[in-house]
């Protein structure tokens, strides 16, 4: 049903071969960075809001997001003539904040992290009676995200493995459920930023837990607390979860730009980072990396490119203390050359 409903708004994004990206691996990219609003999030948000009653629609919807879910909710609500309010952490990329406003939502910036924005959204929901559209821990949202899994099976029927970014777990829950229901032998791998490994910890420790902090430039997956529903689904349907460092994410973003001419945000590049740096057993497997979004702030992108160049050995930063006397710059150039 979600697949039918989403035909009205979501694109069936391309699945492209990435032969140059990771030599020796049969790699494909599911380009949700080219989705409406630049992210997969519109799928879950639109499907959830489309199922609201007339009474719920009249009261409006409220959400919390670091950016991509915000844009999905704003677009869906505006398309259906419904009022939307979105609480966003004050550190959210300006591009995502402004885009959310342009799409018709009222934005409230909340000091702190995503979790602080979530608490504020719940508070407002209790005060106003608006329907809270959870970014990941909701069965209808998960069903919307799961349509990506159906598309992957349609586009690459003999797929062996799919690598998916994880923040709160909504995307991988939907994709894993959809694929495993039809092709249980397909491996589903999750990837988190090493600085925000909430689901990775929960998965390997077999218990639901909250991190003290979630620090990563991949703002789309900087989540301290995974969803309860998503944790249960991940535990049941996901084969393994790994983490990647900030440098590895930066290198993956750069590799996608140079080799595939694709712009991915930090979260969206994590599956490619896992493939590039040998985090998973992919030899001999037709593997799909799900590029979840491409909404990266240009200032962050500039720093990421520099970081990626350093990571790949093509740029070096030097700090040299010199005496204040003639001939020092000549000495430095002689040493460097």
Question: How should these model regions be labeled?
Answer:
Residues 1-337:
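PLP-dependent amino-acid enzyme catalytic core
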């Amino acid at each position: 049903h979600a697949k039918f409903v989403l035909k009205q708004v979501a694109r069936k994004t391309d699945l492209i071969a990435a032969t140059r990206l990771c030599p020796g691996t049969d790699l494909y990219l599911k380009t949700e960075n080219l989705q409406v609003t630049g992210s997969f999030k519109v799928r879950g948000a639109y499907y959830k809001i489309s199922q609201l009653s007339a009474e719920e629609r009249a009261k409006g919807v409220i959400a919390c997001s670091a950016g991509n879910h915000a844009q999905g909710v704003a677009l869906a609500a505006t398309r259906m003539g419904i009022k939307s309010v979105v609480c966003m952490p004050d550190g959210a990329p300006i591009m995502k904040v402004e885009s959310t406003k342009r799409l018709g939502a009222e934005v409230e910036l909340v000091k702190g992290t995503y979790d602080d924005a979530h608490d504020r959204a719940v508070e407002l929901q209790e005060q106003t009676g608006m329907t809270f559209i959870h970014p990941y821990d909701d069965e209808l949202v998960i069903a919307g995200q799961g349509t990506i899994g159906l598309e992957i099976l349609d586009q690459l029927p003999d797929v062996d493995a799919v690598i998916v970014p994880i923040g709160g777990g909504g995307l991988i829950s939907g994709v894993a459920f959809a694929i495993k229901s039809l092709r249980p032998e397909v491996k589903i791998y999750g990837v988190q930023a090493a600085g925000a490994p909430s689901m990775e910890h929960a998965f390997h420790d077999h218990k639901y837990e909250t991190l003290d902090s979630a620090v990563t430039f991949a703002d789309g997956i900087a989540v301290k607390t995974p969803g309860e529903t998503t944790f249960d689904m991940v535990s049941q349907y996901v084969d393994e979860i790994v983490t990647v460092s900030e440098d590895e994410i930066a290198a993956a973003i750069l590799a996608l730009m140079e080799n595939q001419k694709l712009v991915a945000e930090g979260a969206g590049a994590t599956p490619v980072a896992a493939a590039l740096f040998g985090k998973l057993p992919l030899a001999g497997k037709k593997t799909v990396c799900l590029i979840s979004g491409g909404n990266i702030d240009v200032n962050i992108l500039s720093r990421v490119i520099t970081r990626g160049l350093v990571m790949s050995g093509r740029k070096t930063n030097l700090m040299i203390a010199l005496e204040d006397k003639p001939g020092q710059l000549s000495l430095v150039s002689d040493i460097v050359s």
